[in-house]
Amino acid sequence: MDFSNMSILHYLANIVDILVVWFVIYKVIMLIRGTKAVQLLKGIFIIIAVKLLSGFFGLQTVEWITDQMLTWGFLAIIIIFQPELRRALETLGRGNIFTRYGSRIEREQHHLIESIEKSTQYMAKRRIGALISVARDTGMDDYIETGIPLNAKISSQLLINIFIPNTPLHDGAVIIKGNEIASAASYLPLSDSPFLSKELGTRHRAALGISEVTDSITIVVSEETGGISLTKGGELFRDVSEEELHKILLKELVTVTAKKPSIFSKWKGGKSE
């Protein structure tokens, strides 16, 4: 008997075991992220922490109470989240549980692009000045804090209303984080580039400035000409057309590829043939 091969197989089995558990936990977190179940999980973790501490310090009464809470709590979870559990099982049966999160993110990204395009085209035609910065991997919390926090679901109507002249939020930048308008009337750093045309105003200088220190995508609508400009990576792209803007936003902001058929759907398709 070759014990070396057995030990290698045992080692590989352990790796696969860990990867499968990690994958399942990751998918569960992705499924419940942004739902009320997240708050419930936080509460469960707190109870578990209290139980461990009470056991360590010998607090028998507290430990007994936490044991009862955990024992009956899981039953309560099944009852409270029965609709969510049913939907999750139905999703598993349809074979798209592993693509649900990616599809949702992709829809949000396309909604973001559509909202930016509609609002900028509307404002450009009416020469309403605007400055919209979309945060990506580099954190922009310092700049968000300089403005008025909104944390509002993004829409073209809301973006337009923010930049209507003589309204409290029109002066400054809108910063988008994720699929939300994080803040309005935020201050962005101005670029010191000597190559920036002097005919460009503060909005363009701020758009270029933020692109020099973050990986954000920033869109500017000129109130003088109605032209739409875009900055990224320390570069300024002036007077971009509607088609050019769409191509750039699609390339830079959509990170999820088109949904592919899952193993389950392939299996079902093969069985039906």
Curated annotation (Swiss-Prot):
It is an enzyme of class 2 (transferase). GO terms for biological process: cAMP biosynthetic process. Changing residue 172 to A: No c-di-AMP formation (construct without residues 1-80). GO terms for molecular function: adenylate cyclase activity; ATP binding; diadenylate cyclase activity. Optimal activity at 0.5-1 mM CoCl(2), also functions with Mn(2+), for a construct missing residues 1-80. Its cofactor is Co(2+). PROSITE patterns: DAC. Changing residue 202 to N: No c-di-AMP formation (construct without residues 1-80). It is a multi-pass membrane protein. Keywords: ATP-binding, Cell membrane, Membrane, Nucleotide-binding, Nucleotidyltransferase, Transferase, Transmembrane, Transmembrane helix. It catalyses: 2 ATP = 3',3'-c-di-AMP + 2 diphosphate. Its EC number is 2.7.7.85. Disruption phenotype: Essential, it cannot be deleted. Pfam families: CdaA_N, DAC. Changing residue 171 to N: No c-di-AMP formation (construct without residues 1-80). PANTHER family: DIADENYLATE CYCLASE (PTHR34185:SF1). Belongs to the adenylate cyclase family. DacA/CdaA subfamily. Homodimer, required for active site formation. Catalyzes the condensation of 2 ATP molecules into cyclic di-AMP (c-di-AMP). c-di-AMP is a signaling compound secreted into the host's cytosol where it triggers the cytosolic surveillance pathway (CSP), a host pathway of innate immunity characterized by expression of beta interferon (IFN-beta) and coregulated genes. Expression of truncated proteins (missing first 80 or 100 residues) in E.coli leads to c-di-AMP synthesis. This is Diadenylate cyclase. It comes from Listeria monocytogenes serovar 1/2a (strain ATCC BAA-679 / EGD-e). The gene is dacA.
